[in-house]
Structure formats: C-alpha cells, structure tokens
Swiss-Prot record:
Residues 14-33 have a biased composition (Low complexity). Residues 1-13 have a biased composition (Polar residues). Residues 1-33 are annotated as: Disordered. This is Protein sigN132. InterPro entries: HssA/B-related. Pfam families: Coiled.
C-alpha cells in the first residue's frame, strides 16, 4: 500500500488528465489554475479532503488538489 502510494505520487505529474479522471473519479469544474476537481473517491481513496488554498505542487502531488474549486479530492 505504501509503495503503491509513492508510485502513484511520483507518476502523477506525468499522467494525462484523461488517465487521472479514469483512475480517480468523476470531475467537476476546473479552477482558474486548471487544476482538475474531483467529486468522487474511487479506486482506493482513503477519505475526501476539501482544499481551500492553492499550492499547485503540494495539492496536485498529495491530494490531487481541487484548488479554489471547493470540490472534493481523494487522498491516497
């Protein structure tokens, strides 16, 4: 599980948006920084996180971030 999560994080930035959507869940509207917002947790998400601030590197890497969209991201 731990190694799987590390692999997911290391591969996240190189993943296309379509593959991220397929592996992570449904999407809602995009933020001003084009960060994809996830409204569903599928495929092993532990719990939903609500993002309230934008730090692109941290949000995308750690929580597949929603930025300012106010949506729900999945922590892995």
């Amino acid at each position: 599980m731990l190694f799987e999560s590390i692999s997911t994080l290391s591969n996240l930035k190189s993943a296309s948006k379509s593959s991220m959507i397929a592996s992570t869940g449904s999407t809602s509207s995009k933020s001003s920084n084009s960060i994809q917002c996830y409204t569903g947790c599928v495929g092993g998400g532990i719990f939903p996180i609500r993002q309230t601030s934008i730090n692109i590197d941290i949000n995308i890497s750690i929580s597949r971030g929603c930025g300012s969209c106010g949506g729900c991201a999945c922590r892995y």
